[in-house]
């Protein structure tokens, strides 16, 4: 999260007293002191070893040291201020974009200033008539322009539900009634499960949003280029057809 590499490496800091009261309902390789098939039992390792499944990604660990040293050389305060300034400029520039009739081009989810936010901006694009532009259209055009964006639904379902004003009653109805029909086909392969239909039943006009992430390596040319890309949607209606189906969230 701090410098983007390596992936698949992380750590959890926990007190020994806290670990001692945790009991895992399963186990995997490298987490047991002993195990028996005929005895139908196992004895877990104590401490952190009992929670480290498999072989640690030791080949990538030196990169963590190098990355942290690099951050220390630059200074976290400097990095924070730089990303804050880039994020603020990008937010102001995007929110200033309007179609010829005054309709806003984008809707930003979350704070519209740098107060209380990080360097990630989630947004959606809208056509001049106020209709939401499919995030798959944005993704396709961005890829053709050499821009790397994350589109669709993200890791925080609660924030997504709040952004799209989905009520608890609607969500409970969908998951209690429709999921009973969808899930068996998903797990058995007896029938196709349409995520697009699921979204339609929720009343959602989109599969999620467009996410722009700024960080250590981001420079002004990057955010300026994205604003130029966003401007290509002004006063236009997307004509893309045959968008790929959404297989899942």
Task: Identify the role of each PLM range.
Residues 1-249:
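Pyridoxal 5′-phosphate
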